[in-house]
Each structure stands twice: as C-alpha cells, then as structure tokens.
Amino acid sequence: MAAGRPLAWTLTLWQAWLILIGPSSEEPFPSAVTIKSWVDKMQEDLVTLAKTASGVHQLVDIYEKYQDLYTVEPNNARQLVEIAARDIEKLLSNRSKALVRLALEAEKVQAAHQWREDFASNEVVYYNAKDDLDPEKNDSEPGSQRIKPVFIDDANFRRQVSYQHAAVHIPTDIYEGSTIVLNELNWTSALDDVFKKNREEDPSLLWQVFGSATGLARYYPASPWVDNSRTPNKIDLYDVRRRPWYIQGAASPKDMLILVDVSGSVSGLTLKLIRTSVSEMLETLSDDDFVNVASFNSNAQDVSCFQHLVQANVRNKKVLKDAVNNITAKGITDYKKGFSFAFEQLLNYNVSRANCNKIIMLFTDGGEERAQEIFAKYNKDKKVRVFTFSVGQHNYDRGPIQWMACENKGYYYEIPSIGAIRINTQEYLDVLGRPMVLAGDKAKQVQWTNVYLDALELGLVITGTLPVFNITGQFENKTNLKNQLILGVMGVDVSLEDIKRLTPRFTLCPNGYYFAIDPNGYVLLHPNLQPKPIGVGIPTINLRKRRPNVQNPKSQEPVTLDFLDAELENDIKVEIRNKMIDGESGEKTFRTLVKSQDERYIDKGNRTYTWTPVNGTDYSSLALVLPTYSFYYIKAKIEETITQARYSETLKPDNFEESGYTFLAPRDYCSDLKPSDNNTEFLLNFNEFIDRKTPNNPSCNTDLINRVLLDAGFTNELVQNYWSKQKNIKGVKARFVVTDGGITRVYPKEAGENWQENPETYEDSFYKRSLDNDNYVFTAPYFNKSGPGAYESGIMVSKAVEIYIQGKLLKPAVVGIKIDVNSWIENFTKTSIRDPCAGPVCDCKRNSDVMDCVILDDGGFLLMANHDDYTNQIGRFFGEIDPSLMRHLVNISVYAFNKSYDYQSVCEPGAAPKQGAGHRSAYVPSIADILQIGWWATAAAWSILQQFLLSLTFPRLLEAADMEDDDFTASMSKQSCITEQTQYFFDNDSKSFSGVLDCGNCSRIFHVEKLMNTNLIFIMVESKGTCPCDTRLLIQAEQTSDGPDPCDMVKQPRYRKGPDVCFDNNVLEDYTDCGGVSGLNPSLWSIIGIQFVLLWLVSGSRHCLL
C-alpha cells in the first residue's frame, strides 16, 4: 500500500496569496464565510431531504415496535471460529480417508498386475473422456474398446456425469495404443470399484483422480472432457503431471538452480530450445519450491536481478522466464565456473529456501569437460542432485555430461527437438520420488494444495494428494532393493464452496467474514479471493457485482493471493499473519482501512480479528473478522404460519405496485430451492415453495427463511405506512431499503425496474460502505464514456439504520433515496446567489465562464457541477476532468490515496507493460518466434533429420505424438497480469481548505468546504478555462501495471513456513539408473508424422491471423 498525505496549506498562506497577487478578475473571490454559509445551507437541505424521504427513523421505530418477533443473539467470535475450524478439519479428514483407501488399493492392484506385451483386440475396456470431442476419432485403438456412458446433469459437478463409470484422459502427446498405456488402463480399471465405494460412504465427494507417472489420468465420476473448441487450434494441452496437485504430491519441496550454457556454440535453434526447456522446467515448480537461473560461458552470472534462490511463485517465475528469453550466446564453455557459481548459490543458507531437495539443472549442448574437482569440493556427500540436459543437434560426446548426472544422483536427458521438451523436463520428478518410495509409510502423508482452478470446470478447489508407490517385490530382504518407482499421485477435490458452507456468514453482517491461510501466507478462503476469468479483460465499466468464480480449464498455476495483498496491509496485519502461520490462537481489535466492494473507495472501520489453528491439515489457521456493529445479530422467531404467510405475500410480484419492486437475495434457503439470476423467477419459485412446504420444512434453513420473511414484513410496513403516504417530494426519483436478511425494496415500482444494484445485499458495495459510515453516503453512478449520461439514474444517498436493543448496537438495514441531479443543481444555484454580488466571480451561476463549482464524494468522483458539460461527466473521477486541481487537492491533504495491486487480473495480449522486470506474461519461444514459420520449419526439418539419423535403433516404449505446449495459443488468449488501482479518501479532520493553484503564467484561487454529516466536499475555483495548467490525467481506474518491483520484494521476503517433512535422500536408493541408452526416446515415424502436423497447425494459425 502506498499512502500519500502531503502537508496541507493553511488559511493564512491562502490569504497571503490573495494579498500578493489578487484574483484573476477585478471582483473579489467569495470569502470563506460566504462559501461556508452556502455549503451549510445545501448540507442542511440535503440531509433533511434524505432523512425525511428515506424514513430512516420510521424503520427504527418499526424494529423497536416488533421486538417480540425476534431476539438479539451474540456473535461469539472465539466460539464461531473454533467450531468452523473443527468442521473444516473433519471435512478434510474424511476426504483423506477416501484418499488412503484409493492409494492402498492402487498399490495392491498394481503389485498383483502381470505385465503383458500384447492384448487381444478390444480386451481393454474404458471410456476415453475426449471421445466426444473428436467425432472423427477411431472407435478404438488396437487392444482397447471404448465405453459410451449415459450422462446426466449433476448440480454438484455443474456438468454431465455418469456415476456408473470412470473416465480416462490421455495427453495428446501420448499414443493411446502403446503397451504401457494399455497395461495402465488394464490395472487402473480396478480403481473404479473403490471410487464408487467412496462415494457410497460420502455422497458429497467430488472428483476422485489417479494421475499416473506416465501421464494417464483416471477420474470419477465419468464426464466428457472440456470443450476444446473454446481453445484456439482445438489442441488439448492437459497433462495431469503438470497440474499443481500432482507436482506437490510427487516429490518433496525443491531448491533448484537452473544452469544454462550460453557459450558461442549454443546459438540459433539450440538456444531457442534451451529457452523453451527452461520455461517448461519452471512450470514444474510450486510455491513450496525455490529457484534461480544462472548462465555461464567463461564466466557465470544470474540471468535476472535475483541474486539468490527465490520462491517459485507465479511472479518470480515470470521474471526468470523473461530473463531467459533475453539471454544471448557467446564465448567459450567453462563448466568449472558454472558449477562453482551454482553450488555457492545453492548452498547459501542465509536466505529463505525450501531446505529439502537440492538440485542443479544443467542445460547445454555438450562438451568435453567433467569438472570433477568441483563436484569433489562441493558435493562429496552427494547431497545435491545434478540433472543434465543435452539440447539440440550436435556431435559432442554425451559421456561427460552424462557422467555428471550419474555421479551426482541425477539423470541425463536428451532434448534434440521441440517434441522432447515437454516430457523430458518433467520426468526428473520420478527421480525425486525415489526417497519417498523408500521411506514407505512415513512418506504417505496427505498434503493439501493451494487454491487452483479445476480443469473440469468445478471452479476454485483444493486437492488432497497422496503418492502411490510401486511395491512390486519391493524388498526381498533388507538389502536387495527391487523397486523404487512412484506410480503416480492420488487426488481428491474439495470445492471452495464446500468450505464456505462450514463458515456461514449470514449472521455476521456484510462486512464480517472468515478467511484462512496456508504456511506461505496465501489465502485459502477470503472474500477478495476472486480471480478474473481468462477471456475477460479489464472492464470499461467497473461493475458493482463481485466477479464470478472462474472455470478455466487452461489454468495451470495455483491461485496464489497473499493475505497482505487481499487486504490493505498494515503492521498489525503483518503480526496477525505471522501468528497464524505459526499456528497460534489470538484476537486483536484495531482500526483499519477497508477497500470497498467495487474497489473505488476507502473507508475506515474498527475490526476484531479472531483466529485459531486448523489442526491436521496444511492450512495454518482460520480467522473471523467482525466489525463492532456485528457483535450481535437478529434472529427471527416467526412461528405462526399466519404471520409467515402474511409476510411472504408481500414478496409476490403482483404486489410490487403497493409494496415496491422487491428483490430477494439468491441464497440457499432450501436444498430443493435453487437460486436463480432471474429475480422475478426466483421470487415466484420462493413463494410457491413456501406456500407448498412451509418455512419450517426440514430441507430449509429455518433461520434464513424466517429472517427474510421478517425483513419482508418490516420493509413492507415502511412502504405502506410511510413512503406511500408521502406526497411526491421534488428531486426524489426513488426510495429504497436494503436489509441483512436479503430484501431490497425500491419505491415506486417503476424505479425498481431500472435498479442496477446487486440483489445479494451482502455483496452490495453501497450497502457495505453505508454500514461503515455514520454519515449519509452519497454514491455517484458509474461513468461510461460511450454510454448515456450516468446522472440520469440519479445520485444515491444511503444511511445505515442503527438500533439499540437492550444496549446492544445493531445495523440490520440501510435506507436511502435517489435524488435528481438537475433539481439538486437548481437548488444549489439558488442557494449560492441569495446574496447578490457585483461581478461574475462571486457565485456559482449555471455555466459560468469564470467560476467552477463542483461537488465531489470521498473518492474524488464528480456528483454535481454548475456546468452542463460537467454534468454529463457525473460519476467520473475528477482527476480526469480537472487533473491539475485534483493533484493539488492531494498535495494539500484534502485527499489521501492508496495504491493497490490486483494479482488476479487478466489483460489483452501485449497490454501489460513492456518495461520493468518481467511482468509481461512470458512465453518462450516468444510470440514473434511462434508466428515466424521459418523458425518452426527449420526446427522441424532438423528434428526430422536428426530423428532419422539418431533414433532408428532406439524405438520408444511409450510412443509420443509431438505437440508443443501453450505457446501455440499464447498470442490468441487473454493473459494473466497485474493491474493497479488508486483509491482516494479523506484522511484529514479539517473542514475547510483554501489556496491558490499556481500554473506558472497564471493561477487559480480555490476554496474547499466539507459538507457535514455527508461524504461530500464542495469546491469553488476559478475556471480552468481561464488558466491553462497541467493537463496530464490523474488516473484512478484499474490499469495494467508492473506491480511492485520483484527485485526489491525478494530482498525482504514475507514470513512463511515450508512443509514439516522432507524426503530428499535415502541410503538404499539405487541411482545407477541415470539416463542414456536406456532412456525412452520418441518413435521415428510418430515423430516425423507429428512434426508435419505441427508445421501444418502453426502455418494454418499464422495464415488465419493474417
């Protein structure tokens, strides 16, 4: 957070200016006393109007009158957070039991499985999840037979599923008819019975998945794969081994130093292959890992500003990708320099790191040097694994770099062409899994991931993972090791919605909420954890509605949002975060800044944070945040069915004329009553359900329904006994009332038909702001440059209803009005000229040539002006209307500001800033490379030739179909990015400000006056047309940004904790299998055919783009 509070000028300084230079016209500028008298009169008129027309006191009387219909219950924060934490523990524990059953069965079945080289025709029966996406696909591969399940719509999965079958997904670059795949399909079919049994024991289970180390994924229940017609080129790029949950479950955390050879021989195609390979390698790392990339020739250096290992989060990996994309090749190779540099950095324990697997990844075209003395010096005990990658087409002896890997418990890989990158940069996880397998039951610990986006469109989920080991003849005796392979990872999903149900919020008031964090400080649960959907860029109009949860099958990264980025950071929150990570319990009350729901405003409020650990899980702690006015809540006790029926009658659309246009918050009132985005439809369904089954039905949340009925009755009485009996009040376009229970009434009916606010009152920005303010809150409509004048809908004025029941403060509702802008302007103009003056400078005449009079709200948005051309800009940020004056208001402390970053945004390709350290979404090869068909043609031609010359004698058991990663579609998709937005707010108790805006050759006198009991200021200033000044716009709205400098952020990393256990070495490990001729290389004819397909796809894409 960046806050600006420049020193304010005093009234004395302003008076001195007036004496020295005088105003720009011959007539005197109105005195501060005169202006204040105008403002006081306007403020009195506005507050009286809002108070009288809204019926705020009348609603208080109604709540006090009917106290027999409700009780006031306490929100015991400590008790609530403890109960919720235990419920979450129980939920995750139940899911863990399902995982254990699956993992044990998988190991047992695979151990009993007899490997077969041949299968009879159609012997292996399974449902391929991608069958429905490719109607031209053959019904079956040799040895297999396809199942065609009958699917039904399922509300829990939000898609069609079949509980009778499991589905299989096989990556595009894996041949489905290969012997390995057929054997995998054969033995994993036994998991289907366990899947079904788990669901019988717990019908709320979501996806159950086994991800094989070979890339096959079997998941239950069966469901067609996502519609890849949404993806450019219709290429399915999913590989279970690259999903966040698989990466986390397959190996312990890693400290990785990637060492890149940039000598002169590494040039052209080889350098491009290395860049892509490093980028793919970075994608195999998660937030528990640490990484850096260094390059070397005759000298060694870091490729980026990072001078030590950094956390492998999304932002840091982007920095490294961009840096790698800019490396150049020159000089000669000195492996000693490179490895010395790598070991020194990798063994630096003075910085934050994973403190587990220590790895050096060498990417080179080969060489004659072995650097034995460096390994003898730094790695005598072989605690650091070295993996080597021979990249490109060359004639070097592979012996030296293969020796490096074999002598240092690593593995040697060859990447001769594009198609080998994807597989060979992820297979090192199998090697890191060896110590886990050898550790046996000690390593079989359920781990829970960060939040990420489910590939099958379930939304935001977390996944419990458990490694599955190959126990086939694992030990014949204590010393004769037979197997140390990881078969894969078992996963069970938990939807974030399931966790939210355990943290009920509808008694907390809209500004109360739960949140949970993991040991990295990332939030699992938080109202601001709302990533924007890929495919939706920065909106031209910032809607008040909260972003929907995202279903994006392309998302590979976890959705990582630090608690201190989810809220406005301060020292107390840093302390709370640290204590939560340490698993402590605690409570703290303090005053803090709060960003509004629509992210345009900053308010101040008292909050009490109460937190407790969530034991037995990977999530450190759960917290409950309550404002002072949420310590108690209303619990309705409408037991008589007659009263229930009378109140529900007021919700029927037929009664809108009498009761006002009514909106019902789309909540889960009953299990058989599904919320709808169509308000009228939902109201009809709600009333029909209540009439048929009564509010006391066992399938309903009785407290929720009774509260909504109570609010319906109270608000209807406000309409019937007060609003409807008032005569039409000039300047009032509408009246409204919004309640905690979920009722919104707008009167008259016609005004409700144009109501644009969120029917879910707990997510309504103006409602939440009103609760945190004691004043009347004026809210400007959203300005739309391309749309009609926003002012036509009126200015919203709202006020929280405060009641005290037995000394207990409650704010159960907000009332308000919408006022007509033209009437307001007319009224103020009359007010400002009641005392006639002699010249044009001394009042606020309509469309004055020399004087601008404006009213701004506490966010700096325009609400009223004496100029018609300003009127059409009502709702616009004033820094875009009169930027020089707005800057000056900041400089003299009328406004303070907060700059915040949104790490969950998406932007158009190329929209992100190009300068700075790597916050452009990096794809390697670059987009320019992708679109240059010559590069791909060269790559494919060399690859085909090399495969022909080198691979004839090394047919691969697992045949591959060459396919590049997401680089194909990068230039045609939205990209994740960082955006920044600045909120302005009052942070000064002074009521009046005066001064002179110096524009160099001229100046403008101004006076600012706050309107008491509101969130408004009045500004009278000499017209900007009389004195040209700085016209650079001051932007408040969301815009793309580099974000905080990552080079600075890694110097002071935030507090975190890694996993408690580490499996990085085992004395029984057999590391003689370290690559070489035993490696699995692509089949010749498969590679040749797919390389031509690759060329055709890319050239076709390029042709379409042209």
UniProtKB/Swiss-Prot annotation:
Q: Please tell me whether the keyword Phosphoprotein is annotated for this protein.
A: yes
Q: Which residues lie on this side of the membrane: Cytoplasmic?
A: 1098-1106
* Membrane topology field: Single-pass type I membrane protein
Tissue-specific expression = Skeletal muscle.
Q: Superkingdom, according to UniProt?
A: Eukaryota
Which residues are exposed on the Extracellular face of the membrane?
A: 27-1076
| Coiled-coil zones | none
Note one Pfam family from the annotation. Answer: VWA_N
Q: Where is this motif: MIDAS-like motif?
A: 261-265
Question: Which residues does this entry mark as bearing Phosphoserine?
Answer: 121
Q: What is this protein called?
A: Voltage-dependent calcium channel subunit alpha-2/delta-1
What organism, scientifically named, is this protein from? Oryctolagus cuniculus
